[in-house]
Amino acid sequence: MAYKHILIAVDLSPESKVLVEKAVSMARPYNAKISLIHVDVNYSDLYTGLIDVNLGDMQKRISEETHHALTELSTNAGYPITETLSGSGDLGQVLVDAIKKYDMDLVVCGHHQDFWSKLMSSARQLINTVHVDMLIVPLRDEEE
């Protein structure tokens, strides 16, 4: 199946590059669009929704580190990135909103295989929330 718009959900860890590489390898043969999203679940009480990184007045809401990391991932992707998004709040809801708004048909996300991920898995939450195809990539920390 050829996907038309792939959304990569990144946590901005060094392993995020693996997700970008995987999505690019799937998008390139079909000239599919790729977008990046980072959802900060730590500030859910402050703001819920999407912020387009390209909008000047909204950039103030995004930490400089997050903006820099998303820009670096986008620049080093080796493939055009259509949208670079940052959101806050419930991970599943922010992704569902982005999927609807930008007509995405595949979500690529990572799953850290560590102790904490066994207790609180973002991937498990997404499986029960997102209604498009998903690719869950197992990630290992760089020091392993």
Swiss-Prot record:
One of its GO terms (cellular component) is cytoplasm. One of its GO terms (biological process) is response to stress. It is found in: Cytoplasm. It holds the Pfam family Usp. Keywords: Cytoplasm. Its main location: cytoplasm. Homodimer. PANTHER family: STRESS RESPONSE PROTEIN NHAX, UNIVERSAL STRESS PROTEIN A-RELATED. Belongs to the universal stress protein A family. Required for resistance to DNA-damaging agents. This is Universal stress protein A. It comes from Salmonella typhimurium (strain LT2 / SGSC1412 / ATCC 700720). The gene is uspA.
